[in-house]
Amino acid sequence: MQQPVLTITHRMEFAGAHRMDNPGLSAERNQEVFGACNRIHGHNYTVEASLAGPLDPETGMVANLVDLMRVMREEVFEQLDHRLLNEVEWLEGVVVSAETLAVALWDRIKAREDELGAPLVCIRVCESAAAWAEYRGPAAGA
C-alpha cells in the first residue's frame, strides 16, 4: 500500500529591522515607491518552512522535525534575530522585503535539504498576522 504524502511545517519567530531602499533609485523615487518603509523600521517576523513526503511506516513521520528546527535555528534565528537585515551579508544589495527574504531563506534551507529527510516545499515569511510572502521554489511559478 502506498503511504500518504503529508506536509509538515516548523514556525520560528525573530525580530529584525530593515529599510526598503533601492540604491539604483533617487532618494525621492525611493520615498515615492516605499513610503514610510523607506525608513528603518522593524517587524516581529514569523518564518515557516514546510517539508513534504510520504509517511514513513517505521517512524510515523515524514521527517524528523528536530532536524528542521535545527536548520531553521541556524539559518534563520542565528543569522537574522535582532539584526538590521540590510547589513546581513547574504542580503546585501537586495531590497529587503518579505518576498526577497522568502527567496533567500528558501535558497539557504534548500541547500541543506539533505539534512532534513524530506524535500522543502514552501517558505512563508510573515511581517505581521495580516501580511506575508510565500515561496514554493523556482519551478512553482513556471
Regions found by a protein language model. Give the residues of each.
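Charge-rich, low-complexity N-terminal segments
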Residues: 1-142
